[in-house]
Amino acid sequence: MNEKVRIGYPPSRVWGCPTTAMWVYRLGAEKAKQMLFTGDLISGTKAEEIGLIFQSVPLEELDATVNQLTNRIKGVPKNQLMMMKMMVNQAYENMGLANTQTIATLFDGMARHSPEGIWFKQRAEEVGFKQAIAERDSGDPIQGSKK
């Protein structure tokens, strides 16, 4: 990932829940809560530092870095790659990934149909999506939310 890219999940402030739930598995509970409770964006450098991504590099090095990694991986026999992928995926399944993703999908739908979610949709219709996003991501309290 480019070190200057910003990554996060701003819809966690209102109108969404990340359905993959990978934040918890990649970051642990505390950092995942911080990211999701605030909806803040972080740089690629910070994302690497906290373990959200594998590596961040300057934009001008991105293609070469990706090519180097893919060339390294493609030298491994396919059956070996398949077994390693299945083993890692099974470990996530054993930790409850599928169940977590199911409930996250339900919560995503609920978030979009909550009073705050409905307010956000109506606000976007009134002022346009770009302005509604700017208001949501400003850090100010969400209108109509129950505190």
Question: Could you describe each region identified by the protein language model?
Answer:
Residues 1-35, 65, 69:
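CoA-thioester-processing core
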Residues 1-5, 12, 54-102:
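C-terminal long alpha-helix characteristic of the crotonase
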Residues 18, 42-43, 61:
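Short Gly/charged-rich anion-binding patches and loops
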Residues 26, 41, 56:
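Short aromatic/basic micro-patch
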Residues 26, 38, 75:
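Conserved catalytic core of Hanks-type protein kinase domains
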Residues 43-44, 75-147:
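C-terminal alpha-helix plus adjacent terminal tail
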Residues 50-51:
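Structural motif
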